A protein has these predicted regions:
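Aromatic- and glycine-rich beta-strand/loop motifs that create alpha-glucan
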Residues: 1-25
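Hydrophobic alpha-helical transmembrane segments of multi-pass membrane transport/permease proteins
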Residues: 19-41, 56-59, 165-176, 202-207
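Hydrophobic alpha-helical transmembrane segments that constitute the membrane-spanning cores
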Residues: 27, 95-120, 140, 144, ...
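Membrane-interfacial helix-loop-helix connectors in multipass membrane proteins
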Residues: 39-50, 114-135, 181-194
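Long, hydrophobic alpha-helical segments
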Residues: 51-67, 71
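Transmembrane helix boundary and interhelical loop/hinge segments in multi-pass membrane proteins
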Residues: 64-84
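A structural motif at transmembrane helix-loop-helix junctions in multipass membrane proteins
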Residues: 128, 133-167, 217-218
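Junction motif at the cytosolic side of a transmembrane helix
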Residues: 202-218
C-alpha cells in the first residue's frame, strides 16, 4: 500500500506539471455538450430525455483524450523499464496510473456534469442519479482505458487504435450510466443500474490492473 501511495503521488505530480491533458479533457467535455443542443434543437421537452445520454457519451470521449499518454512518458524516458524491475510491480503501477487519471480527469468531469445537466433542463430529482452514475462509472473508464493505453503503447496512430479497442468496452458503462439518469427522470428505481455499475467497478478494480500489466510486458 505504501508503494501504491507513492506511485499515485508521483503520477499526480507528473499530471499536474503537465496539466494540459486534464484541462483539454474538461474543455472538450463542456464544448461538446454545449454544441449538441444547436444540432438537435432546443425543445424543452426533448432536452431532458437526451441530456443524460449526451453527457455520458461526451464524458466517454473526453476521458479518452489523455489515455494515450498514460504510459507514453515513462516509456520514452526509460522509467517504465526501471519500474518493471522494481519490487512494486507493473500491476501496482497500472492501478496508480488509473487512479491518477481519474483524480485529474474523472473528478473534473464529475464536477462539470451537474452544471451541464442544467443546460439540458434535467430535473433536480435526477441530479443524484447523474452524480452517482458518474462516480461509479468514471473510474471504470480510467481502469479499462489503461488496458488500451498499454496495448497501443508505441504504436503508430495509437490514438485511433486506442479508440477502436476501448470504445466497445465502454458501451455497458454508457448504457447503465445513462439508464440510471433516464430512470430517475421517469420516476423509476435506479438501484439496479447503480448496482450493475458497482459490479463493473469491482470487476475492473480486480482485473484491469493485472490485464494492463500483462499488456505492458509484451
Amino acid at each position: 500500500m505504501i508503494g501504491l501511495g507513492l506511485l499515485i503521488r508521483r503520477e499526480l505530480g507528473l499530471a499536474l506539471r503537465g496539466g494540459t491533458d486534464a484541462v483539454m479533457a474538461v474543455v472538450f467535455f463542456v464544448l461538446a455538450a454545449v454544441l449538441f443542443p444547436f444540432g438537435v434543437g432546443t425543445d424543452p421537452a426533448m432536452l431532458p430525455r437526451i441530456g443524460g445520454g449526451i453527457i455520458w457519451v461526451v464524458a466517454l470521449l473526453a476521458a479518452m483524450l489523455s489515455l494515450e499518454r498514460m504510459f507514453a512518458s515513462d516509456h520514452e524516458d526509460g522509467s517504465l523499464d526501471l519500474l518493471y524491475l522494481s519490487p512494486v510491480g507493473l500491476g501496482t503501477l497500472a492501478l496508480a496510473k488509473a487512479v491518477a487519471h481519474w483524480l485529474t480527469t474523472g473528478v473534473l468531469l464529475l464536477i462539470a456534469a451537474p452544471i451541464l445537466a442544467l443546460l439540458y433542463n434535467v430535473p433536480a430529482n435526477a441530479f443524484g442519479a447523474l452524480v452517482a452514475s458518474m462516480l461509479l462509472g468514471t473510474p471504470i473508464l480510467s481502469l479499462v482505458g489503461g488496458i488500451g493505453a498499454a496495448l497501443t503503447l508505441g504504436a503508430r496512430r495509437g490514438g485511433v487504435l486506442l479508440a477502436l479497442l476501448i470504445l466497445p468496452l465502454y458501451i455497458p458503462v454508457l448504457i447503465f450510466g445513462a439508464g440510471a439518469i433516464d430512470g430517475a427522470i421517469a420516476g423509476r428505481p435506479i438501484a439496479p443500474q447503480l448496482m450493475v455499475l458497482g459490479g463493473f467497478l469491482l470487476a475492473a478494480l480486480a482485473l484491469a490492473p493485472w490485464a494492463t500489466a500483462a499488456a505492458l510486458r509484451q
